[in-house]
Amino acid sequence: MSMFCFQCQETAKGTGCILSGVCGKTPEVANMQDLLLFVVRGIAVYNQALRKDGRSSARADKFIFDALFTTITNANFDKHAIIKKIKKGLELKKDLSNQVTIEHAPDECTWYGDETEFEEKAQTVGVLRTSDEDIRSLKELVHYGIKGMAAYVEHAYNLGYENPEIFAFMQYALAELTREDITVDELITLTLATGNHGVQAMAQLDTANTSHYGNPEISEVNIGVRNNPGILVSGHDLKDIEELLQQTEGTGIDIYTHSEMLPAHYYPQLKKYKHLVGNYGNAWWKQKEEFESFNGPILFTTNCIVPPRPNATYKDRIYTTGATGLEGATYIPERKDGKQKDFSVIIEHARRCQPPVAIESGKIVGGFAHAQVIALADKVVEAVKSGAIRKFFVMAGCDGRMKSRSYYTEFAEKLPADTVILTAGCAKYRYNKLPLGDINGIPRVLDAGQCNDSYSLAIIAMKLQEVFGLKDINDLPIVYNIAWYEQKAVIVLLALLALGVKKIHLGPTLPAFLSPNVKQVLIDNFGIGGISTADEDIAKFLA
């Protein structure tokens, strides 16, 4: 059975996974994800038509962003769960089709089939359905941007925040991707519009998070352990960890964060829980080793899951929820009737487990989102004016397995002492435990939070632009050296481009889905570049 996927940075040979995913997904899972996306595009066409006369389906809105999230790298490896979503999507599409007529409807709208036909159909609707290399490249760039946007939309939705304009754009974009006559120029316009709406989606999530949990504040986070049973929470969904904290309060069970959930410790309304005791481990890709010693159950609220080895001792301790899935793991169902998710099964499991084994000790500092940094604006501005801070380096983004990512550790270590790193996302784990010191009390690594908190870094940049009276954001002493891995990094990139940021450097490699011509458009119009060596790049950036 064949597959084709090149949506992540680690795609095989830098061109595409064709036998199995480097991420661990099988061809069956990859193909069912392709078919799910195909069904989603059809639903989007119908719902977009219904929206024009005020009859759009809220059920379709939710299905679309949840299904898109399901197909993000490392989110869902459960073929049966994905097939179930496809069947649900076909039923939803049929219901919508009975409410509106689409002239010259694309195959995405007209195809229906049962499970026996899914695999055969999936072979015809994936990335390679588009023969023109540049059209394919731009279509997938938009696709991946929309996937990343869907993740941020879902997190905001879980906190009660919806923006019909974002729903409408996502579905408009998906409908446009069904067109066989779409041009390169139209797709470039659509790509830029995706970036603009990515800014809106990140702003909405920032509002949702801060209105519920307060503005992130400077916080010390323990990276050791206590002598109580624990639950390890991975992923990004703050609503999930909040409800788990509430349901475990007073039980004697400690809650630890993992990877991208680290910033939960920065929010006042989450850090108030005394049994939110620390962060365990490092970036997502080290979980095969680190989960062995945690001893307690692990909850994946979103990506990033790495399928465990067959002999892993923690296999029966994995729980998934939301858009995530892993065959053999226990799934925590969605909320119903306005009630919380029921985490009792994972809580009872934790009671039977030994406490985690320490793999490191000490503390790390974070919480430098836009409100906190702007509160320190006078201090920061003075440091820049006095020359104490020569340059800021935005090193936000994702971490990953490739050995070449040691570049980011070396880069951080070799930066001069008069520079400051602004970070968000799990890329931080390459350098957030290094003894890099501070500048006049300002830590040299300022962690804003999760990957979506790259929005905070953009807000900080715009505030500095205002303070220094600069017409162009690119005149600031800021260098963008971003590590990417999956589709949320794609929407962050497109959002930064929409905000006018240029000369962004992406690594450790440029995306495989960018054709040579599309890559050249990004270079010519936005100054997008790659990386070389830490020494060469530092010399170039400081010249």
Curated annotation (Swiss-Prot):
Coiled-coil regions, chain positions: none
GO molecular function, one term: peroxidase activity
Gene Ontology CC: one annotated term: cytoplasm
Catalytic reactions of this protein: A + NH4(+) + H2O = hydroxylamine + AH2 + H(+)
Main location: cytoplasm
Iron among keywords: yes
Pfam families in the record: Prismane
Cofactor note as given: Binds 1 [4Fe-4S] cluster. Binds 1 hybrid [4Fe-2O-2S] cluster.
GO biological process entries: response to hydrogen peroxide
Cofactor(s) for this UniProt protein: [4Fe-4S] cluster; hybrid [4Fe-2O-2S] cluster
Residues that hold [4Fe-4S] cluster according to the record: 5, 8, 17, 23
Enzyme Commission numbers on file: 1.7.99.1
Annotated compartments: Cytoplasm
Record bears the keyword Cell inner membrane: no
Entry-annotated residues carrying Cysteine persulfide: 398
InterPro entries linked to this entry: HCP/CODH (IPR004137), Hydroxylam_reduct (IPR010048), Prismane-like_a/b-sand (IPR016099), Prismane-like_sf (IPR011254), Prismane_a-bundle (IPR016100)
Recorded superkingdom: Bacteria
Positions that bind hybrid [4Fe-2O-2S] cluster: 236, 260, 304, 398, 426, 451, 486, 488
Keywords: 4Fe-4S, Cytoplasm, Iron, Iron-sulfur, Metal-binding, Oxidoreductase
Function: Catalyzes the reduction of hydroxylamine to form NH(3) and H(2)O.
Official protein name in the record: Hydroxylamine reductase
Source organism (scientific name): Bacteroides fragilis (strain ATCC 25285 / DSM 2151 / CCUG 4856 / JCM 11019 / LMG 10263 / NCTC 9343 / Onslow / VPI 2553 / EN-2)
